[in-house]
Amino acid sequence: MKLLLNSSGSFSDNGTISVGDIPVHLESIDFDNDTDSDLIVVNRGDNSISLLRNDSGSFSENATLSVGNTPLKTVSGDWDNDSNTDLAVLASADNTIEIWLNDGSGNFSKASTQPSSSGSSPRDLISGDWNCDGYLDLATADYLGNSISLFYGQSSGADFSSPQTISIGKGPASLASADFNNDGRMDFVIAHRFYYTTSSLSLLTGDIGILLSESVSNGQVVYTSETRLAATTESQGTPPADILIQDLDQDSKLDLLLSLPINQKLAVLSGKNYTGSLNCP
């Protein structure tokens, strides 16, 4: 992994650090509470997580976590409410989320494993407070299940509810959340990637969908049917990948920024109707 240090807006080469096989995701958190930003690297090829400790800009391997099959992503949060930053790891081939708790010094131990729907092949994992009850929740994009799964945080910290599965369109691959309709509950944007197949061709394409919250029942958010939107105005080959929600033009409305890797472009969708917020009120 290559490190680039920023000095007054100019980046310089700070060397290379060896990590696991096929690193696919990188996250920056302070896992040892020394105010320096450390690094978490997800290695898909050897089912591991590399923990890189930051000592005043110099990184060294702190530990390697052995995790489930085909890890794709981590998200961080204080799952057990002890003021230390913990990890959730998405193991796609196992259809599970692993919860790893931090002792405050950067030592992680696996506390629980949350199963998702069998054969759903989740591709993305995000965290947030979906029902705005003060507990951090999790959500996965279930690529083969054509659904998203919501895992609601509990007062015990490392445990989550059984998944609430919401059926949506084909091939959900990535997620983002915000309160678009200002109702005090979190909504979702989903990037769909799928093949359009005819007798003569098979084309990787896609679109995006928006799920708006409608109510809460027994602690779970009830959502309206998914609204599907084209990712761009181009007619072919536009499967979106990552999603960023921000007020890009400072008009107090939430906009969408989508990466389109096949087209080597970014798409910007102006949020003309959404004056919501990025987090719970």
Question: Model-found features: residue ranges?
Answer:
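Hydrophobic beta-strand segments that make up the repeating blades of beta-propeller
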Residues: 39-42, 87-90, 138-141, 188-192, ...
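Blade-edge motifs of beta-propeller repeat domains
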Residues: 4-21, 53-69, 101-120, 152-170, ...
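Blade-level signature of beta-propeller repeat domains, shared across WD40, Kelch, NHL, RCC1
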Residues: 239-249, 253-281
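A short loop-to-beta-strand structural motif that recurs across blades of beta-propeller domains
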Residues: 1-3, 48-52, 96-100, 147-150, ...
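Short, conserved, GDST-rich strand-edge loop motifs in beta-rich repeat architectures
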Residues: 193-203
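Glycine-aliphatic tripeptides that mark coil-to-beta-strand junctions in extracellular
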Residues: 35-37, 83-85, 134-136, 184-186, ...
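Beta-propeller blade termini
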Residues: 24-31, 72-79, 123-132, 152, ...
